[in-house]
From Swiss-Prot:
Acts as a regulator of cell proliferation and elongation in the root and shoot. Regulates roots architecture and primary root protophloem differentiation. BRX, BAM3, and CLE45 act together to regulate the transition of protophloem cells from proliferation to differentiation, thus impinging on postembryonic growth capacity of the root meristem. Probable transcription regulator. Regulated by the auxin response factor ARF5. Polarly localized in vascular cells and subject to endocytic recycling. Required for CPD expression and for correct nuclear auxin response. It comes from Arabidopsis thaliana (Mouse-ear cress). Signal peptide: none annotated. It is found in: Nucleus; Cell membrane. The DZC domain is necessary and sufficient for dimerization. A C-terminal fragment containing both DZC domains is able to rescue the short root phenotype. The N-terminal part (1-57) promotes BRX membrane association and is required for efficient degradation in the nucleus. Residues 203-286 are annotated as: Disordered. One of its GO terms (molecular function) is identical protein binding. Residues 223-233 have a biased composition (Basic and acidic residues). This is Protein BREVIS RADIX.
Amino acid sequence: MFSCIACTKADGGEEVEHGARGGTTPNTKEAVKSLTIQIKDMALKFSGAYKQCKPCTGSSSSPLKKGHRSFPDYDNASEGVPYPFMGGSAGSTPAWDFTNSSHHPAGRLESKFTSIYGNDRESISAQSCDVVLDDDGPKEWMAQVEPGVHITFASLPTGGNDLKRIRFSREMFDKWQAQRWWGENYDKIVELYNVQRFNRQALQTPARSDDQSQRDSTYSKMDSARESKDWTPRHNFRPPGSVPHHFYGGSSNYGPGSYHGGPPMDAARTTTSSRDDPPSMSNASEMQAEWIEEDEPGVYITIRQLSDGTRELRRVRFSRERFGEVHAKTWWEQNRERIQTQYL
């Protein structure tokens, strides 16, 4: 950028300097003049660079404003904190004037946190940012133990959980399968989820959920069922005129016992635990209209009696220990007419 100027050294001081100046060549003068012009241009550029700039603190004529943002959810100590903003180019996004309350309505954040945490929640502190939650009452939560099985718990203040209800998807479980699953997995659920007690009032009178479109069947745990010795056996619910048939052991998938959770006919041969519960009160009417008949060992037929007295065949189940898929289809094709005539 700068041109180098050759200088001669001598032992003379001032006189030598004057002599050297006087003996400069035209090329040296031109170089000095060029250097002087360059320095002046640079000085003008640097001195005039900030003439059009205004201090960040601004003045009354500055288009940018230094405002104080008022947050309703912040402590008083945090209010009035200045937020400086730097200007941008003409094509950039215009600066946001935080002094204008129209950008942030006073109640927007308050209403947001009120809708989430309720009207009795504490506000958020700007210094600690801690949310104070109301701990009154047990907190309910749901766990999906496996696909189609949802269990609702309530956290107890003393630790552990209260088992509220169990829901089985009707697309994956019928009532009998749900009862068997509960009997086989009861101990695992109690240990895994630290179940301390059961809400008897909620479980003895379970309410039907309004969203029946989910096709969930509610089964409840009731301790009184284990204490009662007078539970009516399954065959007492059979309508008059039906042929009495009894269950036999030997199927791990379709073990003996009541279709609706009654005690098994033979406790030594059943695969269903004695902890099986009776169904909820909302299913009592279904118990009187639907039952299972064993046509032969390993073949279980579910029959329903309608309100007009007619019967319909609900399903036919085969024991996997006795029937393969092809064998079951063949058996059904051969015995379909006989089953419909005999049971319907």
